Regions:
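Catalytic machinery of carbohydrate-active enzymes
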Residues: 1-169
């Protein structure tokens, strides 16, 4: 079964989607997962992903993965689900539910190559783990500096940074 998984949005959403891909692959190891995204590097080297395409180069997928084959496609928007908006469920729980799989606390996967590890480990010599926090995002063409449904309030960001600053770089 071919699963065409479309992930529209920013790099943060793409990274989060890898947790859902892991959940899908765990429950459906027979699926070949083909990702269409604006951020292909997020999925590179991920063993759960069979193939990666951008929205600019996916025209030939029809004959490769759809025509005369079993397939399903997910082009889902978990941010717009009422359970996420109201805080009843996490984004991961909502997304897994939309994909008809159980969410079992899977975490995002971002797999670096040995060359990348060698190159960047020289730049980040530290005795503490690195903490990355993406507080705001979105499409730069939307002209939205802040979006209540997407971005963390600045005072919350400050609290998070102050809480973790001694333990992380």
């Amino acid at each position: 079964m071919n699963l065409i998984f479309q992930c529209r949005g920013g790099i943060g959403k793409a990274i989060m989607s890898t947790a859902i891909i892991t959940a899908i692959k765990k429950q459906h190891p027979e699926y070949k997962i083909i990702v269409i995204t604006s951020h292909p590097s997020v999925y590179r080297n991920n063993p759960d992903v069979h193939d990666i395409h951008t929205f600019e180069n996916f025209q030939h997928l029809y004959y490769k993965y759809v025509y005369n084959q079993e397939f399903i496609t997910y082009s889902l928007e978990p941010y717009e689900h009422s359970d996420f908006i109201t805080g009843k469920k996490s984004l991961y729980e909502v997304w897994a539910e939309l994909c008809n799989v159980k969410y079992d606390n899977e975490w995002p996967k971002f797999i670096l190559t040995e060359d990348e590890i060698k190159k960047y480990s020289k730049l980040y010599k530290t005795d503490k783990p690195i903490f990355v926090l993406q507080t705001h995002g979105g499409n730069p063409n939307q002209n939205l500096d802040y979006n209540w449904a997407r971005d963390l309030p600045n005072n919350t960001v400050e609290e998070i940074i102050n809480h973790y600053k001694d333990d992380y770089n």
